[in-house]
């Protein structure tokens, strides 16, 4: 009779409750015997001594009471003493999949209590427990002189000493609390004791989460000194939990990092507060930060959401490796979705941490911003109609403030011709009105779209812009008998729109980070936000090509914007200068799952130079991998500042069966200087991972000097799914050097 069940990590001692009545049975009898509970008893021989009320089952005994299974060579049931004795290769199969073994088992007290000698158990995928003896008193199981290890042992290969083991003079498993306690616990590495604790505890496999200490970690840094992280996990309920993590350093003060998570049926929330006493510009002070995100349902159609990122100190995040962001964005919103309409009201707050940052009073607060969209279900003139109404109030303590109201209507009609041409006709109209209040004391802090200062006083500006678009695409598709597919698709978009549309006096609030690239070359309106309008007749032309074959693919794109007359709003470095834009290209080659190569090029038709060059390579070769990225931007876009060039590489090298090495580097090619480097070496097998990593940051951020860090990582594995997701080295060497993985 074959029986299988899923296993979970943890310790479980199982007592089989049987009530046997009956008479003599022949070999291989299968007899359902019952008094209060029906069970199945199978054995080679079953005898019943009616004078002493004793049942003896011998030879391949199997007892199944639908809750657990007992296997043994011999089972004796003394009904008067209410005692069950099992001998010879005793196996106890628990409902959760764990299996216990013993040489001898005695069960008493209505089979609730008992004793096991020569106790062993299989736990989860690979865990093993060995004890000289074990006893059970109700829900509490006590094992003496016990040892636990998840490591595979093999006498044939000579691996008889586990890589690591947890030994204890006494192990107590309280099934009512779902927790396992180890008394006088000693952790051994390769048979050598390395850690002692009077008591250790962890939850049993049936518990999804339970409060307790997570794996600590440590390291040393030239900026922080020696540091240690001591995370503690708090299980609030099935949908809420929290983590408190003290970070203790010898040179830069101490902080406490927290995390709170809660999941709803249709949403969730996350908060990460950080607070500590640390130095800044030569003075010690209390510093803090808060990150978070959430979406909280408050009805059938309404949600409240937020994104939080704020700090009290300019260098706090960088000093403790909390975040490398230098611009922090916060928003709070109220959203409703009903049918085919959506309403969104939000507010935004920004914080600038950059070196040479502007005064925080000059950074705007957006409150409120309103966005309403309606798409009727019925077709309008055969096409789809869309109405969008938005408004925004932008407030500054210093500098000009403004309010905007915009209404946009769009009609779209897609068509497919008999020969496969894809034609989409659309018409669009947008009207905007601004109320701008200039700051007479600071007239030049905010400029309009032409770069002119916003004058003092109250000004009203309006504009209306219609647009007609014809989008044409004709995909040519062919397939071969070898399993190859080819797609060639020419694209042409004709846009008819009047010139102008960007009058003076409109503050450039949300169109400063425009970038022409392969993601928007075939967009009829490339401008982000509502401040800047791409006006005038133009054509977006180009082609896409794709080839698919067994094991890989090749994709390519080329596109350009053509105009009969230059738009003066776009300068030399915009990519849209003159009557011909940059020629935007992209290709991607994939040989799955081994190699992926992507390159993006923007060619300047006026100078013949390359304005943008991006290359991304990923290769996987067994246990080794290589990632390289290169970017060069010669265009001085507003959001990017001066031209820059950078190369970033990361190599993971598998060496033999257990060893691996890691190296990563990032270099500023524009200024010929290194930014970050990291080197690491690690060893791991089926139950333990060890690594040491060296990190060097070459950049200075105010009083946070370039630093060198050494990180130590010890990852005990317990045979659970979490082990598969625990990296031996940090996933991102340069943004989260202190990232940790918790003990499952």
Question: Where do the protein language model's features map onto the residues?
Answer:
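N-terminal secretory signal peptides that target proteins for export/translocation
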Residues: 1-7
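Immediate N-terminus of the mature polypeptide
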Residues: 3, 27-28, 48, 225, ...
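An N-terminal low-complexity intrinsically disordered segment enriched in acidic/polar residues
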Residues: 5, 19-23
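Bacterial N-terminal signal peptides
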Residues: 10-20
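Short, Lys/Arg-rich amphipathic segments at extreme N-termini
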Residues: 18-19, 42-46, 470
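N-terminal amphipathic/hydrophobic interface segments
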Residues: 25-146, 165-168, 172-173, 178-180, ...
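Outer-membrane beta-barrel proteins and related beta-barrel translocases across Gram-negative bacteria
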Residues: 104-106, 111-113, 121-142, 146-166, ...
């Amino acid at each position: 009779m074959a029986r299988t069940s899923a296993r979970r990590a943890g310790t479980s001692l199982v007592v089989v409750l049987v009530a046997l009545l009956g008479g003599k049975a022949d070999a291989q009898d299968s007899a359902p015997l019952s008094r209060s509970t029906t069970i199945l008893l199978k054995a080679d021989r079953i005898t019943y001594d009616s004078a002493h009320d004793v049942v003896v089952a011998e030879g391949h005994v199997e007892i199944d009471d639908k809750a657990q299974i007992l296997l043994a060579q011999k089972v004796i049931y003394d009904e008067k003493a209410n005692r069950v004795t099992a001998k010879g290769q005793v196996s106890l199969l628990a409902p959760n999949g764990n299996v216990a073994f013993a040489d001898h088992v005695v069960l008493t007290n209505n089979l609730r209590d008992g004793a096991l000698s020569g106790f062993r158990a299989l736990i989860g995928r690979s865990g093993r427990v060995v004890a000289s003896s074990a006893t059970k008193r109700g829900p509490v199981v006590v094992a003496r002189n016990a040892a636990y290890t998840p490591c595979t042992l093999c006498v044939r290969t000579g691996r008889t000493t586990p890589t690591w083991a947890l030994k204890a003079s006494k192990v107590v498993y309280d099934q009512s609390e779902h927790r396992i306690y180890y008394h006088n616990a000693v952790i051994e590495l390769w048979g050598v004791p390395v850690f002692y604790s009077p008591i250790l505890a962890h939850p049993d496999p049936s518990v999804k989460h339970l409060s307790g200490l997570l794996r600590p970690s440590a390291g040393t840094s030239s900026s922080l000194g020696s540091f240690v992280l001591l995370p503690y996990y708090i299980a609030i309920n099935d949908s809420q939990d929290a983590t408190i993590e003290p970070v203790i350093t010898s040179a830069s003060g101490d902080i406490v990092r927290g995390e709170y998570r809660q999941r709803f049926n249709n949403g969730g929330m996350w908060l990460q507060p950080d607070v500590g006493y640390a130095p800044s510009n030569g003075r010690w002070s209390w510093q803090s930060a808060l990150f978070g995100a959430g979406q909280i349902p408050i009805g059938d159609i309404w949600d409240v959401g937020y994104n939080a990122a704020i700090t009290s100190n300019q260098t706090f995040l960088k000093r403790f490796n909390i975040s490398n962001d230098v611009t922090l964005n916060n928003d709070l919103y109220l959203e409703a979705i009903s049918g085919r309409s959506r309403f969104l009201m939000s507010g935004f707050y920004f914080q600038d941490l950059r070196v040479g940052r502007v005064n925080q009073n000059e950074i705007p607060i957006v409150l409120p911003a309103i966005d309403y969209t309606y798409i009727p279900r019925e077709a309008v003139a055969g096409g789809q109609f869309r109405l969008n109404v938005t408004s925004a109030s932008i407030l500054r303590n210093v500098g000009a403030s403004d309010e905007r109201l915009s209404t946009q209507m769009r009609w779209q009609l897609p068509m497919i011709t008999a020969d496969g041409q894809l034609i989409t006709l659309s018409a669009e109209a947008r009207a905007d009105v601004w109320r701008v209040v200039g700051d007479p004391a600071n007239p030049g802090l905010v400029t309009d779209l032409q770069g002119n200062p916003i004058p003092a006083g109250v000004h009203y500006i309006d504009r209306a812009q219609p647009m007609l678009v014809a989008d044409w695409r004709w995909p040519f598709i062919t397939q071969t008998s070898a399993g190859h597919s080819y797609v060639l698709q020419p694209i042409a978009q004709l846009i008819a729109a009047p010139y102008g549309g960007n009058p003076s006096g409109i503050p450039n609030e949300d169109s400063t980070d425009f970038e022409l690239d392969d993601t928007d070359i075939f967009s009829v309106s490339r401008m982000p936000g509502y401040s800047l309008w791409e006006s005038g007749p133009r054509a977006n032309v180009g082609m896409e090509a794709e080839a698919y074959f067994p094991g890989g693919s090749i994709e390519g794109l080329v596109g350009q914007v053509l105009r009969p007359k230059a738009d003066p709003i776009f300068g030399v470095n915009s990519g849209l200068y003159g009557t011909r834009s940059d020629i935007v290209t992209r290709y991607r080659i994939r040989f799955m799952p081994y190699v992926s190569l992507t390159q993006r090029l923007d060619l300047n038709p006026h100078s013949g130079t390359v304005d943008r060059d991006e290359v991304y390579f990923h290769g996987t070769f067994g246990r080794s991998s290589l990632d390289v990225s290169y970017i060069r931007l010669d265009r001085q876009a507003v959001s990017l500042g001066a031209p820059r060039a950078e190369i970033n590489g990361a190599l993971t090298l598998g060496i033999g069966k257990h060893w691996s090495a890691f190296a990563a580097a990032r270099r500023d090619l524009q200024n010929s200087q290194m930014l970050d480097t990291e080197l690491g070496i690690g060893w791991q097998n089926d139950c333990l991972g060890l690594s040491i990593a060296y990190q060097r940051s070459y950049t200075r951020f105010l009083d946070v000097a370039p630093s060198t860090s050494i990180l130590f990582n010890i990852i005990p594995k317990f045979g659970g799914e979490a082990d598969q997701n625990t990296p031996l080295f940090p996933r991102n060497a340069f943004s989260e050097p202190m990232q940790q993985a918790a003990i499952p």
